[in-house]
């Protein structure tokens, strides 16, 4: 399958220069990015982009797709109460099939937001993988070892199985939280990382309560504790990282770890504001994630981008902190770097994960600076087209995912009502 996008404003993300040109795709790879040129190629489809913007798709570097069933069911409470009173009890009722359908709903929402990859952590990886493959969507799974259900053996099996099967799916070692795992369990994950020389990810330093409890228990911050156990000897990183000391950040810099910030979720749960400017000053690779639809509650990278820069400016009392260019990198190329994916920029040889943003809408006019428009005034309504792995899955408000959308909504509602009984 060969697709030609022409008459396009092109933002490659290799830099922020935007030019009028073309992007050619063959099968799942980009084969040309540049100015208009003649070619003897025969294309299966040629798309006039009408001087709208074509750019790399967003990478949602932290989410829980299967939690769509909790959207607006448990709100207006802090993290620990939310988890212990609402989330954990109802999760015991979930079936693999439930998670499959709930994940499909999340993927639809990712597509409308221009998200072409998600880094997903939830209870049943098989269900999320099946949903992703059925919809031809790119997903990186993260192990979610904890003391209640998922074992280290489960994660090792998934790591070996799902890094071989399909180019749309990959699997990263991980565990849910420091406080939901015994020291022995975390040491087992670290041993697995050493065995495969593989990175590890987890939720980390999300709340003051978590940090203080870890210090009382171990005498160390969560970051120091995990480093002491050898968790990060082969890299990786963490989600949230809201309450980080200077020493914590130095450890992340020293070990070349990645941080995924989740501003909307951290605001809604009153967890705090991550010190993004301080992280950037230490040249830590920062990515952007929505967190799950239960704690956010929407899967919208435009909102995350605006909040990432806006909250950093507020926290530092500095209007120049964390500018639009830094945030766009967090949403694209930085996520690709953290997840070791061959995407995040538009250039020949990269995976054909790209989006078209509608510039012919009031919120994107006038065109002084398109990159800033995306971050400061862009919205999901500007997403005209989302291509994943060379296939258009969303275009002009229509999904091309192989099933009736309303039928999925009905199925999800039926399953949610069963869980609520």
Predicted regions and their residues:
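Active-site microenvironment of metallo-dependent hydrolases
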Residues: 1-21, 25-26, 31, 39-41, ...
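Divalent metal-coordination and catalytic microenvironments
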Residues: 8, 23, 28, 51, ...
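Active-site gating loops and adjacent loop-to-helix segments of metal-dependent hydrolytic enzymes
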Residues: 69-101, 135-143, 208-235, 255-258, ...
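Alpha-helical scaffold segments that flank or form the walls of functional sites
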Residues: 71-137, 156-165, 412-421
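Metal-coordinating catalytic core of metallo-dependent amide/deamination hydrolases
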Residues: 127-245
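Histidine/acidic-residue-rich catalytic or RNA/ligand-binding cores of hydrolases
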Residues: 208-220, 248-252, 270-279, 296-313
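His/Asp/Glu-enriched, well-ordered alpha-helical/loop segment
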Residues: 228-235, 277-360, 377-380
């Amino acid at each position: 399958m060969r697709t030609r996008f022409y008459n396009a404003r092109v933002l490659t993300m290799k830099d922020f220069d935007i030019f009028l040109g073309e992007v050619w795709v063959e099968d799942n790879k980009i084969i040309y990015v540049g100015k208009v040129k003649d070619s003897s190629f025969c294309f299966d489809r040629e798309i006039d982009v009408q001087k709208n913007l074509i750019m790399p798709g967003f990478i949602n570097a932290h989410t829980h797709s299967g939690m769509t069933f909790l959207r607006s069911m448990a709100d207006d409470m802090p993290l620990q109460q939310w988890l212990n009173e609402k989330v954990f009890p109802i999760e015991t009722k979930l079936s693999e099939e439930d998670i499959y359908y709930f994940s499909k709903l999340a993927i639809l929402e990712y597509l409308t937001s221009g998200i072409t990859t998600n880094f997903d952590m939830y209870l049943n990886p098989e269900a999320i993988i099946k949903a992703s493959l059925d919809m031809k969507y790119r997903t990186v799974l993260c192990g979610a070892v904890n003391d209640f259900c998922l074992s280290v053996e489960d994660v090792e099996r998934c790591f070996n199985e799902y890094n071989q099967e399909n180019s749309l799916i990959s699997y990263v070692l991980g565990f849910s939280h420091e406080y939901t795992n015994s020291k022995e369990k975390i040491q087992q994950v670290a041993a697995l990382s050493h065995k495969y020389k593989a990175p590890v990810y987890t939720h980390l330093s999300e709340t003051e309560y978590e940090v203080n409890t870890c210090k009382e228990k171990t005498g160390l911050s969560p970051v120091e504790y995990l480093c002491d156990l050898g968790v990060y000897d082969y890299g990786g990183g963490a989600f949230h990282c809201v309450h980080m000391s200077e020493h914590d950040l130095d450890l992340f810099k020293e070990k070349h770890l990645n941080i995924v910030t989740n501003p909307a979720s951290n605001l809604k749960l009153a967890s705090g504001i991550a010190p993004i400017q301080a992280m950037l000053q230490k040249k830590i690779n920062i990515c952007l994630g929505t967190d799950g639809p239960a704690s956010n509650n929407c899967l919208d990278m435009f909102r995350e981008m605006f909040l990432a820069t806006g909250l950093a400016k507020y926290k530092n009392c500095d209007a120049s902190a964390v500018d639009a260019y830094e945030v766009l990198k967090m949403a694209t190329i930085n996520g690709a770097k953290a997840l070791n994916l061959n995407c995040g920029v538009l250039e020949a040889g990269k995976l054909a994960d790209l989006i078209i943003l509608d510039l012919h809408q009031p919120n994107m006019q006038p065109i002084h600076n398109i990159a800033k428009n995306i971050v400061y005034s862009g919205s999901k309504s500007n997403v005209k087209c989302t291509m994943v792995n060379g296939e258009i899955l969303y275009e002009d408000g229509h999904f091309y995912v192989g099933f009736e959308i309303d039928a999925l909504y009905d199925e999800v509602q039926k399953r949610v009502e069963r869980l609520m009984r």
